[in-house]
């Protein structure tokens, strides 16, 4: 397009991420507001349209835009398929509407409009793409028009609602401007709206002396579904290394029966594409996935790119790892912390491209086993280019695969992970406890540009994080954080033990004492004081109210008490609206005015 042709300006596109470098995220089947600033020099009227299509197809779907205010235009668009899409804009000078508005003003002022009516005839004659009905309508208007007729009647005929509609469909698009093509990815709904329940399969036997199996997990499925969850997330299920194995409470002196951390992946039994033999085999895993689906649950797996020192890859591909000057392999560190049972891979030098292919193939392997959701451990410590490539490779074949970024790191890093392809992200919700903190953070997530590429998943706790708030708040605090997590966000999650208000900490730390990361546990979820009914209620509200699905519909309201958070959610048509008042003080009742 020549510079002189770009007379109509198109800018400020809401679904344009970094100039089109990254795809904005939408949900397949959900209507989305597509907006842009569109304007022209002078006072001429303009018109605009959005064009969209599924990537790889030829035909565009056109949706006309509507003027909002201050040169802002909007179209309501639905991307039907879970797939990659493309989006662009057209804008042009609307000479017919300009003529109609100007002549109406002159007629109202009593001015002669004979020449203007002739100009109107010529505009009507200029229709280019009219169908048979529109062509017949225009011909009839022109045929009924005559210079001897009263000017007002002639203008009324030329500007009738039928004429306006026909000209909107088929009038020439003068000074047509086309915007660049932007990428869009339409996720399936579970990327934006899901309730996760996290467990360690090895602790599901009911006996702290017996390693759990997939069959034990199958017996727990009715319980998880009865609570109202739809995603069942497992920590790593692979063989656990024996070299430098950790003991209870992360000790360096394990006992002979200590199971080790499931994040120390790999042993002589296999690596990331193998199953811990005490859990079961691929046949029993397949039965588990099938049984979960029958209960309305999806299985999510932990994808942790790290290896135990006895992982087969270290022997088979030493070039994928870092080695110290004395010839020993370098274990993972985050000074002053050390992770003696874990070795990190190196993504460049001799590891490129074979390691990248191997990791992609691990994900595809589990996809073929029926897993379509992956929680990724510490993605912020791996290269952004790898994630962009790997997620793109997987979703080009399986667009229904969802990746959750377990990244508790700097804001810009978390947002970059969303841009490169992650459908969900852990968030700072875990540490936002006061009214001001929650309002500020949720306002950022729901109103700023990041809402188009970063979807938070509000986990109230994790195996690694025993929040200080929960350590000191008792049962009431667990109910508070449950209500906030389940109703503020579209995605939220609980790690098992939450329902019995488990909060015993390692003194002075946000960690669980006797964490099942390092030992088998047996849980009694029916013990006195449990909050199962609260969880069921929250998930029932989420399932039965359409307003709960889109977290960007969140709005905060006045409650004149710093311990009371007031907020609501509604559907676009306001047919479903929920108002929440949450007492953030777990120790005392509160009153408020609003």
From Swiss-Prot:
It catalyses: alpha-maltose 1-phosphate + [(1->4)-alpha-D-glucosyl](n) = [(1->4)-alpha-D-glucosyl](n+2) + phosphate. Pfam families: Alpha-amylase, GlgE_dom_N_S. The keyword Transferase applies. The gene is glgE. Maltosyltransferase that uses maltose 1-phosphate (M1P) as the sugar donor to elongate linear or branched alpha-(1->4)-glucans. Is involved in a branched alpha-glucan biosynthetic pathway from trehalose, together with TreS, Mak and GlgB. The keyword Signal does not apply. The active site is at residues 377, 406. Its EC number is 2.4.99.16. It comes from Cereibacter sphaeroides (Rhodobacter sphaeroides). The record marks 464 as: Transition state stabilizer. Belongs to the glycosyl hydrolase 13 family. GlgE subfamily. One of its GO terms (biological process) is carbohydrate metabolic process. Keywords: Carbohydrate metabolism, Glycosyltransferase, Transferase. It comes from the Bacteria. This is Alpha-1,4-glucan:maltose-1-phosphate maltosyltransferase. Residues 244-270 are annotated as: Disordered. InterPro entries: GlgE, GlgE_dom_N/S, Glyco_hydro_13_cat_dom, Glyco_hydro_b, Glycoside_hydrolase_SF, Ig-like_fold. It is an enzyme of class 2 (transferase). Alpha-maltose 1-phosphate binds at residues 246, 306, 341, 378, 517-518.
């Amino acid at each position: 397009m020549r510079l002189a042709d770009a007379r109509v300006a198109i800018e400020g596109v809401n679904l344009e991420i970094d100039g089109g470098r990254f795809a904005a995220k939408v949900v397949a089947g959900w209507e989305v507001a597509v907006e842009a600033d569109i304007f022209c020099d002078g006072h001429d009227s303009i018109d605009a349209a959005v064009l969209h299509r599924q990537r790889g197809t030829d035909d565009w779907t056109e949706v006309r835009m509507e003027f909002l205010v201050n040169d802002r235009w909007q179209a309501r668009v639905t991307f039907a398929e879970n797939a990659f899409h493309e989006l662009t804009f057209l804008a042009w000078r609307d000479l017919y509407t300009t003529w109609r508005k100007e002549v109406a003003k002159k007629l109202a002022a009593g001015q002669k409009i004979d020449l203007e009516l002739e100009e109107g005839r010529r505009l009507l004659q200029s229709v280019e793409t009219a169908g048979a009905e529109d062509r017949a309508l225009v011909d009839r208007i022109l045929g009924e028009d005559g210079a001897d007729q009263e000017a007002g009647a002639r203008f009324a005929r030329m500007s009738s609602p039928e004429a306006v509609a026909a000209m909107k469909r088929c009038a020439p698009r003068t000074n047509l401007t086309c915007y660049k093509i932007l990428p869009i990815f339409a996720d399936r709904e579970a990327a934006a709206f899901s309730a996760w329940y996290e467990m360690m399969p090895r602790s599901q036997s009911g006996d702290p002396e017996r390693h759990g199996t997939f069959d034990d997990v199958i017996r727990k499925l009715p319980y998880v579904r009865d609570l109202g969850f739809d995603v069942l997330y497992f920590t790593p299920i692979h063989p656990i290394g024996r070299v430098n194995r950790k003991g209870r409470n992360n000790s360096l002196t394990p006992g002979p029966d200590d199971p080790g951390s499931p994040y120390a992946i790999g042993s002589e039994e296999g690596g990331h594409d193998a199953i811990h033999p005490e859990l079961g085999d691929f046949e029993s895993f397949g039965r588990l996935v099938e049984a979960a689906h029958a209960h309305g649950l999806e299985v999510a797996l932990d994808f942790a790119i790290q290896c135990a020192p006895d992982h087969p890859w270290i022997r088979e591909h030493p070039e994928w790892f870092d080695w110290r000057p004395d010839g020993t392999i370098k274990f993972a560190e985050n000074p002053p912390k050390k992770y003696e049972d874990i070795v990190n891979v190196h993504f460049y030098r001799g590891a490129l491209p074979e390691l990248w292919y191997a990791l992609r193939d691990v994900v595809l392997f589990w996809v073929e086993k029926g897993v379509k959701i992956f929680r990724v451990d510490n993605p912020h410590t791996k290269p952004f280019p790898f994630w962009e490539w790997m997620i793109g490779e997987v979703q080009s074949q399986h667009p229904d695969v969802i990746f959750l970024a377990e990244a508790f790191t700097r804001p810009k890093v978390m947002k970059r992970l969303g841009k490169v392809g992650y459908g969900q992200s852990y968030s700072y919700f875990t540490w936002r406890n006061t009214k001001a903190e929650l309002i500020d953070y949720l306002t950022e997530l729901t109103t700023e540009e990041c809402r188009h590429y970063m979807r938070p998943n509000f986990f109230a706790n994790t195996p690694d994080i025993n929040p200080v708030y929960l350590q000191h708040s008792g049962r009431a605090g667990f109910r508070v954080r449950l209500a906030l997590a389940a109703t503020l966000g579209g995605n939220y999650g609980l790690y098992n033990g939450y329902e019995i208000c488990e909060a015993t900490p390692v003194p002075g730390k946000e960690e669980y004492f006797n964490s099942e990361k390092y030992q088998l546990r047996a849980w009694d979820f029916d013990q006195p004081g449990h909050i199962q009914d609260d969880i069921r209620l929250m998930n029932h509200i989420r399932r039965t109210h359409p307003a709960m699905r889109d977290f960007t519909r969140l709005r905060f309201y006045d409650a004149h008490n710093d311990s009371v958070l007031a907020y609501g959610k509604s559907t676009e048509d306001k047919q479903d609206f929920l108002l929440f008042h949450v007492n953030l003080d777990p120790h005392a009742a509160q009153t408020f005015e609003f």
